[in-house]
Amino acid sequence: MKKFINVYIKSDYDIVILRLSVIIIFMLFGTYKWFDFEVMALKPLISPTWLNILYIMFGVHGGSYFLGIVETITFLALSIGFFRPAAGILGDIIVIVTGLVTLSLLPQLGKVDSFVIKDVLLLGVGSVLLKYDLKNHLNIKN
């Protein structure tokens, strides 16, 4: 057990698992944005908020597609980040911005639910991945 713990402590397994988790989340939710069930699920959440500007600019479906494109860019950048830290940095920043944008809806929604509160985790995850990718990109050792 001690050997396993030492191997784990010296490895990047935690970051790999964290990155894969976020990739899966953004891949799933980014893909969902192209389907009517998600378009309709987002409508009551987005309509009363400042994000309604997406509906004004692109329509209800177009607003959902826009979010899908952003989430697709995010998971692709995070995936490429395994090999190119600069791409990972882009993905990490979008993860953080996504969390901030979604959390900014709280005052207008007037309630806390799982749609919004999960984004607290995105701030933390994005920050951890950003630090890791910046260190790799700048060749900074611990």
Annotate each language-model stretch with its function.
Residues 1-73, 77-142:
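Membrane-interface extramembranous regions
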